[in-house]
A protein has these predicted regions:
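Thiol-/selenol-based redox modules, centered on thioredoxin-like
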Residues: 339-372
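A short beta-strand-turn-helix
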Residues: 232-253
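Conserved redox-active cysteine motifs that mediate thiol-disulfide chemistry
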Residues: 257-274
Length: 372
C-alpha cells in the first residue's frame, strides 16, 4: 500500500503536465488541413492531415492550454485560406463555415468573442475597401475625402480595439484571449498591455504570446526615467564595444536603431546629421546600432552617407540582441539618453528631435558642457 501511494504521488505531477486534445471538423474528402503553432511572430506548421470520409482529426498533448490555428487552403488558386483559431484543450470542433471553434468552455468562449468582434472587423474592412476603390478609380481624391476616410478608419479601429481590450480585461483567467493579443497587441494601449503582463493574465502565459511578453519587457526597459540597459556589439573594425562605452559619460546621446536596407531610416539620417553637426561641439553624440545581417551593405551605407558617429552591430538582423532587449519591432527607432544614463525620450524623429535638442542645449549648464 505504501509503495502504491509513493508511486501515485510520483505520477501525479506527470498527469497534470500532459493534457490531451483532439480537434475534429468536416471538410470535403481529400482536403488537406493544417495545424499551425505560433511560438513567435510567424506561424509554423506543426501537423497536417488529409480528410477521410468528409472529416479530419488532429490529436496531441500540451503541458498547458495553447492557442493553435487550423487552416484549410482555398479550393481555387488566388483565394484566401480559411483560418480558425482554437485553444488546444480537450475535444475541439472546428466549423470552417463560421470560422469558429467549439466543444470546450475555452473554445465556446472564443467562438462568442470572435462573433462579438466580427461586426467591428467588418466595419474596418468596409473603410479599407473605400480606400481601395478610391485608388482604383484613378481619380485624384480631395483633401476632404481623404480626411473623412481617415477619420472613419480611426473610429472603426478604435471601436474594434475597445471591444478586444474589454474581452481581455474581463477574462484574465482564460487562455483564449491570447488570439486577440497576438493579432492586436500593437494597437492596444501600452498601459493596458502592461496590466495584463503585470497581473499575470492567463492568456499571457501560453507560448503563443511569449513574444509579446518579451516585447513588453523590452518596452519597459526603454520607458523614460529608466537607466539604459547595456549590451555588447562590434564596431566597424570588429572590436567589441559596449553601449556604456558611449552612454552615461556626461553627454546627451541619441541611440539610433537603423539598417542599411531601411528606407525610412536612411531618409531620417540627414536630419540627425544636421543636429549632430549643430550640437556635437556642445557634447551631443550619436550611436548608430544597425540591424543589418551582412557587413558589406552596412559598411557601404556608412561610407556613402558619411556617418561621423559611433557605429556598432552584431549583424543578426531582427535577431539582434538590441531588438529583444529594447522591444524593437520596427525601425527607425531611437533612445535619447541623458548625461547620467537615464532614458529621457524614445522614438524622436525630425522636428520632434530637433525641438527636444533645442530645449536641452538652450540650458546654460549644458551649453557650457565640454565635448567628450
Amino acid at each position: 500500500m505504501k509503495k502504491f501511494l509513493i508511486l501515485a504521488a510520483l505520477l501525479l505531477p506527470l498527469a497534470s503536465v500532459a493534457q490531451q486534445y483532439k480537434v475534429t471538423g468536416k471538410v470535403p474528402t481529400k482536403t488537406k488541413v493544417y495545424l499551425f503553432r505560433t511560438p513567435g511572430f510567424v506561424k509554423e506548421q506543426a501537423d497536417s492531415v488529409v480528410a477521410k470520409n468528409g472529416t479530419f482529426t488532429f490529436t496531441g498533448t500540451t503541458t498547458q492550454p495553447e492557442l493553435y490555428y487550423i487552416v484549410k487552403k482555398a479550393a481555387k488558386t488566388g483565394q484566401p485560406a480559411t483560418i480558425v483559431p482554437i485553444v488546444a484543450d480537450g475535444n475541439v470542433v472546428v466549423d470552417f463555415t463560421t470560422e469558429t471553434p467549439s466543444g470546450t468552455a475555452e473554445n465556446d468562449a472564443l467562438k462568442a468573442a470572435l462573433m462579438q468582434v466580427k461586426p467591428y472587423a467588418q466595419g474596418l474592412r468596409a473603410v479599407e475597401k473605400q480606400f481601395e476603390d478610391l485608388e482604383l478609380s484613378g481619380k485624384e481624391p480631395s483633401e476632404d475625402e481623404l480626411t473623412k476616410l481617415a477619420d472613419s478608419y480611426e473610429q472603426a479601429q478604435a471601436l474594434m480595439i475597445e471591444a478586444v481590450a474589454a474581452i481581455c480585461k474581463n477574462n484574465m483567467d482564460k487562455t483564449y484571449p491570447a488570439y486577440f493579443i497576438i493579432d492586436y497587441y500593437s494597437l492596444i494601449e501600452k498601459p493596458t498591455l502592461y496590466k495584463f503582463y503585470d497581473e499575470k493574465a492567463k492568456f499571457m502565459q501560453p507560448s503563443a504570446t511569449s513574444h509579446v511578453s518579451q516585447l513588453i519587457e523590452g518596452w519597459k526597459r526603454r520607458e523614460p526615467g529608466q537607466t539604459f540597459t547595456d549590451f555588447e556589439m562590434e564596431d566597424l573594425s570588429g572590436a567589441t564595444r559596449k553601449l556604456s562605452d558611449y552612454v552615461g559619460k556626461g553627454n546627451y546621446v541619441l541611440v539610433d536603431f537603423w539598417a542599411s536596407w531601411c528606407g525610412p531610416c536612411r531618409r531620417e539620417i540627414p536630419n540627425v546629421k544636421a543636429l549632430y553637426d549643430k550640437y556635437h561641439a556642445q557634447g551631443f553624440d550619436v550611436v548608430g546600432v544597425s540591424f543589418d545581417s551582412d557587413k558589406a551593405p552596412w559598411l557601404n551605407a556608412i561610407k556613402k552617407m558619411n556617418l561621423p558617429w559611433h557605429n556598432i552591430s552584431d549583424l543578426k538582423g531582427w535577431k539582434s540582441k538590441a531588438a529583444a532587449l529594447y522591444g524593437i519591432n520596427s525601425i527607425p527607432s531611437t533612445l535619447l539618453i541623458d548625461p547620467q544614463g537615464k532614458i529621457i525620450a524614445t522614438d524622436l524623429h525630425g522636428e520632434e528631435l530637433e525641438t527636444q535638442l533645442n530645449t536641452i542645449y538652450e540650458k546654460s549648464d549644458v551649453a557650457s558642457m565640454p565635448n567628450k
